Swiss-Prot record:
Main location class: membrane
Record Gene3D superfamilies: N-terminal domain of the delta subunit of the F1F0-ATP synthase
Transmembrane portions of the chain: none
Lineage start: Bacteria, Pseudomonadati, Pseudomonadota, Alphaproteobacteria, Hyphomicrobiales
Keyword Cell inner membrane tagged: yes
GO molecular function: proton-transporting ATP synthase activity, rotational mechanism
A UniProt-annotated Pfam family: OSCP
Bilayer disposition of the protein: Peripheral membrane protein
Protein name per Swiss-Prot or TrEMBL: ATP synthase subunit delta
Length: 186
């Protein structure tokens, strides 16, 4: 499984790097990021689309036509529209989530930013997000872009992943630690 994961990661890095170079040449990194975000939203909102990109049952031609139609319908044209078609034609749609994440990372590094994935038990207000960004900027020494995900199962607190660092202040983790400590005592 680790071999498959590193294969996808390698494919994602190569495709994201290539897309970034083209976007940089066309001076359209921001619009490419925006279009990738729109496609990612479509992906997270549709089980059928996730099945299309991950299933080997669909032929390259079927994937190409479907992705082309979806991109056109969503108004994703130009560089990203063509890129999605190339990825479909090359049977690499399974790597799209990784490609999008890798592109964001490359673009953030180019802007001198670092990206942080934040998991919260509830939606963060814009004031909370700004305070978190300022705190993380103090730790990282760079501007920080945060990607917030809501997961009620952590009960409270935050889990922040920034580069190779992870800060877990979730209530779930604290309760698990307490449970372990009580087992050792009793």
């Amino acid at each position: 499984m680790a071999e498959t994961s590193s294969l996808i990661s390698g494919v994602a890095q190569r495709y994201a790097g290539s897309l970034f170079e083209h976007a940089l040449d066309a001076n359209s990194v921001a619009s490419v990021e925006k279009d990738l975000g729109r496609f990612e939203a479509l992906l997270s909102g549709s089980e059928d689309l996730r099945r299309l990109i991950s299933s080997p049952v669909f032929s390259s031609e079927d994937q190409l036509h479907a992705i082309g139609a979806i991109a056109d319908k969503a108004g994703i044209k130009g560089l990203v529209g063509n890129f999605l078609r190339v990825v479909a034609q090359n049977r690499r749609l399974f790597a799209l989530p990784g490609i999008i994440a890798a592109f964001r990372q490359i673009a953030a590094e180019h802007r001198g930013e670092i990206s942080a994935d934040v998991v919260s038990a509830h939606e963060l207000t814009s004031a909370q997000q700004n305070e978190l960004k300022a705190t993380l900027k103090g730790v990282a020494g760079k501007d920080v872009t945060i990607n917030v995900t809501v997961d009620p199962s952590i009960l409270g607190g935050l889990i922040v992943k920034m580069g190779s660092r992870q800060i877990d202040t979730s209530l779930r983790t604290k309760l698990s630690s307490l449970k372990l400590a009580l087992k050792e005592v009793g």
